[in-house]
Amino acid sequence: CLPKTAWPSDFLDLYAEKTPHWNETNPGYYGGAEGGGEFLNTPWVYCMLNNFGGRLGLHGHIDNYVEGIVNASKQAEHMAGIGITPEASVNNPVLYDLFFETIWADDGNNLQKINLDKWFKNYVTRRYGADSDSAYQAMEILHDTVYNPAYNMKVQGAPESVVNARPGLDIGAASTWGNAVVDYDKKKLEKAAELLLADYDKLKNSAGYQYDLANVLEQVLSNTAQEYQKKMAAAFRSGDAEEFSTLSDKFLSIIDKADDERADIDE
């Protein structure tokens, strides 16, 4: 039955790229109601949230919303459009560029899924101002790692850097609702950084390139810091003071390098 309180005239499917509710029929869940979804047949907007609390880090669910928006447009009767609901939006610019192109079509009533291979090639060229096969390959790796929803479904937003966490031997997160789980292959992201650097002389005058390069390098450093923290914990537990001291120095140097990369990012 309908709640006794006033029913909203429209809804935001707030985190639809990860946990869509527009097609929820279980009344025990947000948006769900017996006998029908779409918030009891109320106009609603498919939203991308992505960022919680301004957390830094490369993270997104590209394939989810590229497919999800098209599927919703074909199946839903009350979808009113798309929107973004991030708690901060100063990182991962590719997400927003792509998100708003998902409904850019000659026939709005017949949306088609974007060809991501073609889209990424065009994106790299227009963002960096030149063709670059290595930069495109780097983007493919980002799509397969940090922007792959199969690897980024933990709690809220991007994996947090252990550098931001309270010091400890076992670090699971830097904040209450965060996580520090990096479940993609970290070596692949290092390869993406190498590929971006391959055409540095060709692309260095592009502000977009410099921004993306700094963000990728910062994420690589964050991932590396996580590995050193684990080694430090192991050295501490084994009582190897010399090894712990050596690893600590390297860990601190990673923090300095990450600070340098953050300083280079022109937001």
Residues covered by each model-derived region:
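Catalytic-core regions of glycoside hydrolase
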Residues: 1-138, 148, 152, 156, ...
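Solvent-exposed, amphipathic alpha-helical segments
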Residues: 98-101, 141, 145, 227-238
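Histidine-centered catalytic/metal-binding microenvironments
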Residues: 175-267
